[in-house]
């Protein structure tokens, strides 16, 4: 009791290893690219890079919206209803997290064949498979945090179940749902393995990074990596900040 407890300091020291491990490569790649600024400027003005970035941003955004459209209702059902096979449904939702992404590409190609091959539909299909669990689980957790008594009060006052959902449940769960949408977007824009197999074209920035690295080496692929990472991190931070303000 009399001694000073250093437990938190110990835990902070241990945890700082991961912080440094994650932050260091980001700092290093930005620093090295800053020293090769001419290459960065040249890459930014490359029409192929611009188109690839546009493809990545548009398909990731479409994926996040589709994840919300179908994931929010499913998350509500999982939060409010106990039914036979619920554990199986939850397991199916989490399966994409553990499947290797190249295998995901093969699975989608075997299932849908030419319907998604080398198309925007294929890119979105690959992104959706790996990112949907984040939207669904975040929505479920958000609705679980909503006190059911509030919903019951609204129902006793004459509100329909649908009106109660939109006026009570959804607004309270919205921060968690928004976090899930951000994670779905981030997971989609970071996907490479499945997209390489399903839809090499139209080319996304992720695939272009791999192509440049394989064909031209590290120096050629680094500027695209920095640009994609900068855009992704910028959007991610801004959205997180907006959600934080909404919560407070």
UniProtKB/Swiss-Prot annotation:
GO terms for cellular component: plasma membrane. Residues 1-9, 78-91, 137-164, 245-248 are cytoplasmic. CDD domains: TM_PBP2. It is a multi-pass membrane protein. Residues 31-56, 113-115, 186-223 are extracellular. Gene3D superfamilies: MetI-like. InterPro entries: MetI-like (IPR000515), MetI-like_sf (IPR035906), Mo/W_ABC_Transporter_Permease (IPR053405). Keywords: Cell membrane, Membrane, Molybdenum, Transmembrane, Transmembrane helix, Transport. The chain crosses the membrane at residues 10-30, 57-77, 92-112, 116-136, 165-185, 224-244. Part of the ABC transporter complex WtpABC involved in molybdate/tungstate import. Probably responsible for the translocation of the substrate across the membrane. PANTHER family: MOLYBDENUM TRANSPORT SYSTEM PERMEASE PROTEIN MODB. This is Molybdate/tungstate transport system permease protein WtpB.
